[in-house]
Curated annotation (Swiss-Prot):
Family: Belongs to the NAD-dependent DNA ligase family. LigA subfamily.
HAMAP family in alphabetical order: DNA_ligase_A
Residue ranges crossing the lipid bilayer per the database entry: none
Protein name as annotated: DNA ligase
One GO cellular component term noted in the UniProt record for this chain: cytosol
Residues binding Zn(2+): 413, 416, 431, 437
Amino acid sequence: MQNIDFISEAEAKKLLEELSCKIAAYNHAYYIEDNPLVSDAEYDQLVNINLKLEQQFPHLVLENSPSKEVGAKIANKFVKVTHQVPMLSLSNAFDEQDVRDFVDRIKNFLRLDEFAPIFCEPKIDGLSFSAIYKNGLLITGATRGDGYVGEDITANIKTIKNFPHKIDNAPECLEVRGEIYIEKQDFLNLNEEQEEQGRDQFANPRNAAAGSLRQLDASITAKRPLKYFVYSGGVTEQNLASSQDQLLTKLKKFGFSVNEISKLTKSEEEIFAFYEYLKTNRENLPYEIDGVVYKLNDFELQNRMGFIARSPRFATAHKFPAIIGQTKLLSITVQVGRTGTLTPVAELEPIEIGGVTVSRATLHNFQEIVRKDVQIKDYVFLQRAGDVIPKITGADIEKRPNDTIAFEAPLFCPSCNSKLYYVPEDIIIRCDNGLNCPAQHYERIRHFVSKNAMDIAGLGRKQVEFLIAKGLISNPLDIFFLKKNNEASLIKLENMDGWGQKSVEKLLKNIEKSKNVSLPRFIYALGIRHIGEQNAKLLAREFGSYNNFIAQMELLSKNDSDIYQKLNNLEGIGDKILIDIIAFLDVKENIQLIKKLGEILNIEDYKETRAQSSLTGKIVVFTGSLPTISRAEVKATAEKLGAKVAASVSSNTDLVVAGLDAGSKLQKAKELNIKIIDEEEWLTLIKNA
């Protein structure tokens, strides 16, 4: 930590201004973008320096001081929800002395002679939430946001397994608060799926949980393995309990998930013993924790202590030290993904960190290497502070050998040697050689057979590599001729190393089974850049059948403006995605592949099971902020009733639902004489639909 004991007033003023800007930027990245720029340890250090400076120079405290803020101002993505009781963050304790000071402050504030019982519980590394129930029914779920105003995630929170939608014998009004998280193994599985689908991997479980929960489309959230714990109440019409331990017992009876690993302590020694127990056993827990939370157990004493601007006086978080290791960077290799994106990978001298032996770590992108000043043969720092996958935080410059080599981003693809292209807006380097690039070729086949695409069990990474190397397959189409090619081969697959009669028979059976495929899966399996499962479903819904899909794709490849505008009007599809689709279609082999696959596969027409309603087949546009319903929920309801939700107003639009601050879409609807209704009329419409 920076030595500020002897800092001058002028230096302190300058440093406080710098810290205010830095911490505000880090808050925005963490709370709004779900993309932390620094580790928790680095962030906590900056906040602590800021706090100590303000204590030394109270007359220098800034109007926008980080000590007055909780998180970050919320994004405009969701409907805003004001917390009736602010959801404040906790102050931090970094060592035993900080904890003793916390206990002493309680005694001094309340004028207690004896130790007041402290309730201790793990600090879950997830996303804070609030859920409000009226007469036992869940009516609002919200994120913490900036502590005063959060985001409405009601539709998303309802998708979490075992999250109560209704509570028996509940008070008229009940608010619970807690943490939503993803377990370690679920996180690893999720990242595997992300990789198979050609999507960016999540940096850590917290990012994955936050990114999953803050989806405008709740159906995406529903597919993610989110879990939760409740740990406190907010607004309630009646007192549920007189202490923290009693409250958790009551909430558990209501059906909420409560963390059983907690302890009511009656001395400082018991506090420290519990902290050491969790610190020692944290790796054995299925979820990530980054410390222990200490709260005054008695609610009456909590009320007496109250709050300061940023946090409650009656609670603090005792943080674990970051798990850090140091090892040598042997080399940097470059991987080529399915869509041609290049990713630098650090090859390391094996090191055990956090109970895991690490020999490789992603460097994310080439700008990261420059920003962190990492060179080959450097001794680099690895950290696991809430991360399942260790990350390189930087190089030990003082130990830098004389023979280090600065890494230079490649100009040519390491797989096919074609010229590479830099994509500034995505901060990536890409190979555009498509199927002529062996690495993309391999990754494309891997994607084609993956679980959420054609779902051909028995064709994993090793099997695909083997079949390509032996010349048995060279593109997705060849998979369906594997039986024929194998029969014509001099050496049969079942006689080769790693294979047998039963495994080959099982594989061929799975290939045959996969020939019956839904249109969304088929479109997703093609591996078009930015066409994930959700966008594949959007396209399938628009086209309805394979025949219509291929016909429209051929028109699009010929720059047909009508089909371009039609697709551009779909919610979720825009210019950027259309450019990627056209780039895919510009490769003649891709159109041919789609046609040939269409000849041998049974591609089922798109069908969505829903009751007929007055909205079936209607094109609906939502504009402005709806006062009581989130955009995700209103869109899901419309689609469930058979409507198509469009992103813009056109002459084909049947209905416009206008909320607060509706803009150009509302004006255009008036010009085109399209029916316009408000939220209240919409609720009546769907009730009677």
